[in-house]
Regions:
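ABC ATPase NBD coupling module
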Residues: 14-18, 56, 68-82, 90, ...
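Catalytic Walker B motif of ABC-type/P-loop ATPase nucleotide-binding domains
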Residues: 169-173
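Helix-to-loop junction immediately C-terminal to a conserved catalytic motif
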Residues: 52
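Q-loop/switch helix immediately C-terminal to the Walker
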Residues: 87, 95-111
């Protein structure tokens, strides 16, 4: 990931104008693990949203694997990214089952072909992956995600974000919805 001279201002030209990113430069190499620390309103989430394409930047350039993604839409950038949001309600489809959410995550960035739903092999794979979490979700594959606790949902979101082995994993307070025991696990 490389961020070159990134600027982002909210509500420009108004009394509520707020410069969130001011000439941000950052270069990360494959395998780097970075934690961004700052107070409320420091621009941490804004930076992640800019990288993900949720909010376009005012100026600057965003490169992933030396590919300029600055003008790419959020859904096109998703090919490169895995993401866990601060809010455990974001990143999953509440009215769909656990296995359906996992299937969507597994197919992220792939061509959508007409085919049957979730295969038996996929279901078994999902059970094994969920078992690792130790939350009992492997026995609730058809349960609606909206019925899960915040911590269960956040753990599921983390699993979904890593199913495709993304080039870049964006974590915005990934343990926010988890209780201390779930966070430790």
């Amino acid at each position: 990931l490389e961020l070159k001279n990134i600027y982002k201002t909210f509500n420009p030209g108004t009394i509520n104008e707020k410069r969130a990113l001011n000439g941000l430069n950052l270069k990360l190499n494959e395998g780097d693990f970075v934690t961004v620390i700052g107070g409320n309103g420091a621009g941490k989430s804004t930076m992640l949203n800019a990288v993900a394409g949720t909010w376009p930047v005012d100026e600057g350039q965003i490169l992933i694997d030396n590919i300029d993604v600055t003008k790419l839409s959020e859904h096109k950038r998703a090919t490169y990214l895995g993401r866990v949001f601060q809010d455990p309600m974001t990143g999953t489809a509440a009215t769909m089952g656990i296995e359906e959410n996992l299937a969507l995550a597994k197919r992220r960035g792939k061509s959508r072909l007409l085919r049957s739903g979730i295969t038996k092999a996929e279901r078994e794979e999902y059970k094994e992956l969920l078992k690792i979490l130790g939350l009992g979700l492997e026995d609730r594959l058809t349960s609606k995600v909206g019925l899960l606790s915040g911590g269960q949902r956040q753990a599921l979101t983390l699993l979904m974000a890593t199913l495709q082995k993304p080039k870049l994993l964006l974590l915005d307070e990934p343990a926010a919805g988890m209780n201390p025991q779930e966070t430790e696990e």
